[in-house]
Design a protein with these regions (language model features):
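Rossmann-fold NAD(P)-binding glycine/threonine-rich loop
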Residues: 1-14
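Short Gly/charged-rich anion-binding patches and loops
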Residues: 3, 82-85, 212
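Extended hydrophobic/Leu-rich segments
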Residues: 8, 34, 90, 237-238, ...
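Generic structural signal for beta-strand residues in well-ordered domains
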Residues: 8, 38, 58, 92, ...
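Predominantly a Rossmann-like dinucleotide-binding segment in NAD(P)-dependent oxidoreductases
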Residues: 11-16, 21-175
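NAD(P)-dinucleotide binding in Rossmann-like oxidoreductases
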Residues: 103, 109-253
């Protein structure tokens, strides 16, 4: 980061961190809803990011982002900085006062490896039943090829199947997910208390069956609930005269 800053200063350029989720129809419309004032002030925000197991294993268990030592950032900064930005941006009438966070490596660690599991999948007696077997996961499914095969040093369309098989016998992409040198957490929770008394929580879970970002905002006179993947949310407004609530689906598709 310092190198980038120094080069920008040298060239007279600006370096801007762009948190692009602010500009999606989903979050920008929610922001307008909150700023409109009908729901009153924010009382509580709950944000969840579930990282699909294919993405998580390729990038954060076997991929280069598995190592804070190599990449200079933990999982929260590498994967979830968008969500911490959203929390503060949606509630930008105030500022964070207190922050607490905890997490650990819970799933992808050696204690969870089946008995007799080997360092590399090609030697492992559990290959047939293991959902993370490198040959099924990387070779057959080939979820994110432009990450996996980069170490071979050839254009993707020139790499043969035989070269890929040999590569998996010696590279981290061929290692047991429970035995890599991953040094980051695989799930983390963040709690924030804001200066105006509102609170926010963020849960990031790595290795989920389905990817998704979910948000639930509770305001004085209503709520907003939705998944960005659906590109729609529920606007729940408290009806003061009837002492009940009314739901309206805001579909942005």
């Amino acid at each position: 980061l310092f190198d980038i800053r120094n080069k920008a200063n040298e060239k007279g350029c600006k370096v801007v961190v762009c948190h692009v989720l602010r500009y999606t129809p989903f979050y920008s419309t929610i922001k307008k809803e909150i700023d409109g004032g009908k729901l009153g002030k924010i009382m509580s925000m709950q944000l969840n990011e579930h990282v699909w197991y294919g993405h998580f294993v390729n990038s954060y268990v076997r991929g280069k982002w598995r190592s804070e030592k190599e990449c200079g950032s933990g999982l929260l900064l590498a994967k979830c900085c968008h969500d911490t930005d959203l929390m503060c941006w949606l509630n930008n009438v105030t500022t964070p006062k207190k922050v607490s966070s905890f997490g650990s490596k819970s799933l992808f660690c050696e204690k969870n490896a089946p008995e007799g599991a080997t360092q590399y999948c090609y030697q492992c007696p559990h290959r047939k039943d293991c959902p993370f077997d490198a040959y099924k996961f990387e070779l057959e499914k080939d979820f994110i090829p432009f990450y996996t095969w980069l170490g071979i040093g050839k254009p993707l369309d020139e790499i043969t199947r035989e070269e890929k098989i040999e590569f998996l016998k010696k590279d981290v992409y061929g290692q047991c997910v429970y035995k890599t040198d991953m040094d980051i957490v695989d799930r983390q929770c963040v709690s924030v208390e804001f200066a105006n008394g509102s609170i926010g929580t963020l849960n990031m879970i790595g290795g989920a069956s389905k990817a998704g970002r979910h948000i639930h905002i509770v305001c004085e006179f209503g709520e907003i609930v939705g998944y960005i993947e659906d590109n729609k949310y529920i606007l729940r407004v408290f009806d003061k005269s009837e002492l009940c609530y009314k739901d309206k689906t805001i579909d942005l598709n």
